[in-house]
């Protein structure tokens, strides 16, 4: 029964507005307290922003940089609130983490022209893992509000030769838009997508881990954007066009009558008179 409840809960969360995930998640947990831990670990929530007091830069919060009630900043490598003996990446990974944050900072600026990004790395038995977080919220100009949250988790298995590695990418994107215009009223549109991809790639000075991961994330985000555009925006446009028309009812009837007259005229023209 609990497994069926979990499947139904996840299916419901996929269909509810992303901007209300936290509220809906709390409501679901109130209805089914036994699912609390599974729901919290399975449902991606919108990213929250904090500020690094040492560097004065924003960073994003998630389970991967959390230890207790404190969150580690990728810029200073410090926990806020301060925490003794918090989990830290190895020296090698910390160096890679710094490079990755600067690389994806440039990527975010190029593609999103603003927003906040953070990258966190941690050690695994046969390699390491990373999470790339990107958040861009609309400023509300032109009566449009919205937010994009993308979470990319990469598992890297380094081969014994050190020349190749296996990458497993799991990406989730959450997008919502809200328009409020006098002519059309208020409209909400949102959704989320999760996709996976695996590949092997060479590792060298000219093709390091950051470049390989960056290429996978870039390709995945482009695929997700195209899918969201086709499914959510394309289908919504078709539905709205089917519900509303720019023509008046009188014009539609006149156009239909004209089509019938043309069809009848063509039919009469094609019918040959019988010969005596």
Swiss-Prot record:
Q: Which UniProt keywords apply?
A: Actin capping, Actin-binding, Cytoplasm, Cytoskeleton
For this record, an example GO cellular component is: F-actin capping protein complex
Instruction: Indicate where this protein resides in the cell.
Output: Cytoplasm, Cytoskeleton
Protein name in the entry: F-actin-capping protein subunit beta
Q: What does this protein do?
A: F-actin-capping proteins bind in a Ca(2+)-independent manner to the fast growing ends of actin filaments (barbed end) thereby blocking the exchange of subunits at these ends. Unlike other capping proteins (such as gelsolin and severin), these proteins do not sever actin filaments. Forms, with CAPZB, the barbed end of the fast growing ends of actin filaments in the dynactin complex and stabilizes dynactin structure. The dynactin multiprotein complex activates the molecular motor dynein for ultra-processive transport along microtubules.
> Quick check: keyword Amino-acid biosynthesis in the entry?
no
Subunit annotation: Component of the F-actin capping complex, composed of a heterodimer of an alpha and a beta subunit. Subunit of dynactin, a multiprotein complex part of a tripartite complex with dynein and a adapter, such as BICDL1, BICD2 or HOOK3.
GO aspect biological process, one term: actin filament organization
Q: Reply yes or no: does the keyword Transmembrane apply.
A: no
The beginning of the lineage is: Eukaryota, Metazoa, Ecdysozoa, Arthropoda, Hexapoda
| Single GO MF descriptor | actin filament binding
* Family from the record: Belongs to the F-actin-capping protein beta subunit family.
Q: Which organism is it from?
A: Drosophila melanogaster
Q: Name one Pfam family in it.
A: F_actin_cap_B
Q: PANTHER family given for it? A: F-ACTIN-CAPPING PROTEIN SUBUNIT BETA, F-ACTIN-CAPPING PROTEIN SUBUNIT BETA ISOFORMS 1 AND 2
Q: Which InterPro entries match?
A: CapZ_alpha/beta, CapZ_alpha/beta_2, CAPZB, CAPZB_N, F-actin_capping_bsu_CS
List where this protein forms a coiled coil.
none
């Amino acid at each position: 029964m609990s497994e069926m409840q979990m499947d139904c809960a996840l299916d419901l969360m996929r269909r509810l507005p992303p901007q209300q995930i936290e509220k809906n998640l709390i409501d679901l947990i109130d209805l089914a307290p036994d699912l609390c831990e599974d729901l919290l670990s399975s449902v991606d929530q919108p990213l929250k922003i904090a500020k690094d007091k040492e560097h004065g830069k924003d960073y994003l919060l998630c389970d991967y940089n959390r230890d207790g009630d404190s969150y580690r900043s990728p810029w200073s490598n410090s926990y806020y609130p301060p925490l003794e003996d918090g989990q830290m990446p190895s020296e090698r990974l910390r160096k890679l983490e710094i490079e990755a944050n600067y690389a994806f900072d440039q990527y975010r600026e190029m593609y999103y022209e603003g927003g906040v990004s953070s990258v966190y790395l941690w050690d695994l038995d046969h390699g390491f893992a990373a999470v790339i977080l990107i958040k861009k919220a609309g400023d509300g100009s032109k009566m449009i509000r919205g937010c994009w949250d993308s979470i990319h988790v990469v598992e890297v298995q380094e081969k014994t030769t050190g020349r190749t590695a296996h990458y497993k990418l799991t990406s989730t994107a959450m997008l919502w838009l809200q328009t409020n215009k006098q002519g059309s009223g208020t409209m909400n549109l949102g959704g989320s997508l999760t996709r996976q991809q695996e590949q092997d790639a060479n590792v060298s000075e000219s093709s390091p881990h950051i470049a390989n991961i960056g290429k996978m994330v870039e390709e995945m985000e482009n695929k997700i954007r195209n899918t969201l555009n086709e499914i959510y925006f394309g289908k919504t446009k078709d539905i709205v066009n089917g519900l509303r028309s720019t023509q008046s009812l009188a014009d539609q009837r006149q156009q239909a009558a004209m089509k019938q007259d043309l069809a009848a005229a063509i039919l009469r023209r094609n019918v040959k008179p019988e010969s005596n």
